Amino acid sequence: PDLVVCLKHPTIESTGALMKHRDVAVILSTGGSGLVRAAYSSGKPAYGVGPGNVPCYVDRSADLGKAAEAVVSSQSFDNATLCCSEQALVLDRPIAQRFLAEMQARGAHVATDAERKRLEAFCNRGGQMNADIVGIDPWRVADQAGFHVPQSTTVLLAFQDGVGRDHPLSIEILCPLLSVHVVDGWEDGCRVAKQMLHFGGLGHTMSVHAMDQEVLDAFFLQKPASRIVANGPSSMGAVGFSTNLVPSFSLGCGPQAGNITSDNISARHLVNIKRVAFPTGDWKERERKAHERAASMTGAGMPRGSMMEGDPGRRGSSGPAPELPAAPALTPRVPGGTTF
C-alpha cells in the first residue's frame, strides 16, 4: 500500500509543501524550469531535467527514405509530446527537396507561406508554446490555425529562415509540427543545430541522419546535447525504446543546463546503495610500484608513511614500547537506571 500516492489537488503551494515534507528523501522533478528550480531550492537532494528543442539534421549522405520513415514514426509516437521528439528539420540543401518529397509520401503536409503565418500566430503565444495544441493531431492543429489538411496527415512542416524570437516556430512545440531550415553543408547544419539547442534545448537531445562517418563524428563531438540519436527516431531513441539507452522519460541535460546529471534518470538513481569494499590482490606491492614510478619521474624518495626503503619516517625501534594509559573503569548499568 501507498507505493504510489498522488496529490488530489496539485497546486504550486501543495507541490512546494510536498517537496519540503520531512518524509521526502529525494526529489525527481520533471517539468518546466520553474518546477525544477523549486526542487533545487527545496533543501532536499533533487534530480531535475531540462526542456528540449531537438534539431534533426539530414545530411546529403543520408538514406532519405529511412530518415523520413524515422521522423514520421517519431512524430506519430504519442503525437510528439515527448521532449526528445524532433522540433526542427535541418536539411542539407542538395537533398532538401527530395527529402521533403519522401516526407510527403508518408503523409506530411508542407505549409504554404500563408499557412505558415497562421501556424506562427496560433502556435506561439508571446514566445511560449500555445498549451492548447499539446498532443493533438496535425489536422486539428491546422483546423484551429485556420486552414484545412486531410485527417490522414502525419506531420505539418513549415519553413523558417532562422532561429530565435523572430522565428515563432523555432521554439519547442509538442505536437506533430516541425520547422524546416535549409542549410549549405554539414558545417552550416552544425551552426543551426547549436542555435536550436541554445534557444531552449541546451544539453538535451538532437538527431542526425548521415552515412558519412566524418559528419556523424562532427555532430557527436561538437553538439551540446547529452543524447545524439543517429539514423533513427529521436523520440523513441532517446528514451531507450529503439536504442540501448536506459529506458526513461526523465532525461537529464547535465551541468551545462543546470542539471546534476546528463543520464536517462531511472529507478537506480533513486536507490540508496551501500558498498562494502575488500582489498584486491597484493595492494602493498601495487603501492610500492606506484611509488617507484613516481620517484623515477620526480627524483623524490619514498613518501613519509609508506614504510618502504627510503621513507624518511621509517626508523628502527629504540627502547621499550610506550605504556598505554589505563582504561577508565566502567560501571555496569541495567535498564531502569539500576547500578550493580
Where are these regions (language model features)?
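ALDH superfamily catalytic-core signature
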Residues: 36-164
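Short, surface-exposed connector motifs at secondary-structure boundaries
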Residues: 1, 17-24, 197-203
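Conserved C-terminal structural/oligomerization subdomain of aldehyde/semialdehyde dehydrogenase
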Residues: 147-340
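Short, structured coil segments at secondary-structure junctions
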Residues: 22-23, 42-43, 223-224
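PLP-dependent aminotransferase-like
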Residues: 1-8
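Short hydrophobic/charged patches on amphipathic alpha-helices used for structural packing
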Residues: 15-16, 68, 190
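Short acidic loop-to-helix transition motifs that present clustered carboxylates
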Residues: 8-14, 31-35, 212-213, 237
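Buried hydrophobic positions in well-ordered alpha/beta secondary-structure cores of metabolic enzymes
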Residues: 4, 27-28, 52, 92, ...
